[in-house]
Structures are given as structure tokens and as C-alpha cells.
């Protein structure tokens, strides 16, 4: 099944937004290691009718240095988010996640959100929302690559919200 990739500018069907920052704009420090390190509020709309679940991956493709990126750092992995869910509230705890939502392991080797904390320069943070044609089995806290492998062939649409952050000093 082919996946349609959308960006904020295209006036797409599936949309992910945050009331805390605009697409390609700065992420407020409260959502970073320099602040409270809590997850930003996220909202989505126009989920395809055939979707059975949603997945969210937040990562930084500019690690460790945007001038010479060597890896993508994973900040948050969620899957089996119910399609009826309109989004995630600011600073959401694991217990408050929508019923059925499962967490994966980020690159700090733990579940949950880990905010931006770039060592060098201004980094991009990609909030990628996937509409899936299935509800995935319990993957036992997968890393991003394991989740992506399980999603193959089941992605109906994808939306992306990009935020940026650079530490001061």
C-alpha cells in the first residue's frame, strides 16, 4: 500500500499541529531540557476513514551537529493511538495517554517524551504522525526501527510538524 507523504504547506488531508509552536518555528524552552522537558500539546485532524490506529515518532535528524549530522536521535515513540483521539495534551503522562496507546523506547533508552537538548547549533525536530490501516500487536516497547518495520505496508497517510531549537550560551 503506497503512503502519501504530506507537509504542512501542502494543504494536506491529514494534519498535525501544536498550539505551542508553528511549523518550522522555534519550540518554546519549556518543552526542552532547558525548561520542564514536558511534551508539547499536539492536535491532529482529517484522519483517513480507513485508519484503524495512529503512530507518532518524534526525532531529530541533525544529531549531533546540524553542519555534520551523523545520526537521527529519537525523542518519542507512540503507537496504537486511537483514531478517535484528537491529539495529546501538554505534558501528558503515560497514564493519561489515550486508551490503547502503547509506548516505544527513545534514544535515552526509556519510554516517554524526551525534549530537545541539542549539543551544537539549531536542530530540527520532526513530529511525524502516521495513519495506519491496522492496530499493531503489542511490540513490547519497540525502538523506532522496530515500529517502522511493523508499520510497513500499513501506512495510509503521514503528516509532519517540524519545530526547531537551539540552546543559548
Give the positions of each predicted feature.
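N-terminus-centered regions that define maturation/targeting leaders and the start
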Residues: 2-169
Amino acid at each position: 500500500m503506497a503512503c502519501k507523504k504530506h507537509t504542512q504547506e501542502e494543504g494536506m488531508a491529514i494534519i498535525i499541529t501544536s498550539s505551542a509552536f508553528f511549523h518550522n518555528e522555534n519550540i518554546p524552552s519549556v518543552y526542552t531540557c532547558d525548561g520542564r522537558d514536558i511534551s508539547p500539546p499536539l492536535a491532529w485532524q482529517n484522519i483517513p476513514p480507513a485508519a484503524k490506529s495512529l503512530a507518532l515518532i518524534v526525532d531529530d535528524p541533525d544529531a549531533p551537529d546540524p553542519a555534520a549530522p551523523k545520526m537521527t536521535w529519537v525523542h518519542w515513540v507512540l503507537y496504537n493511538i486511537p483514531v478517535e483521539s484528537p491529539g495529546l495534551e501538554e505534558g501528558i503522562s503515560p497514564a493519561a495517554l489515550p486508551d490503547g496507546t502503547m509506548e516505544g523506547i527513545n534514544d535515552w533508552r526509556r519510554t516517554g517524551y524526551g525534549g530537545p537538548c541539542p549539543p551544537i547549533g539549531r536542530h530540527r525536530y520532526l513530529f511525524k504522525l502516521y495513519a495506519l490501516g491496522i492496530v499493531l500487536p503489542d511490540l513490547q516497547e519497540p525502538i523506532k526501527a522496530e515500529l517502522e518495520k511493523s508499520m510497513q505496508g500499513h501506512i495510509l497517510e503521514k503528516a509532519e510538524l517540524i519545530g526547531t531549537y537551539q540552546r543559548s550560551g
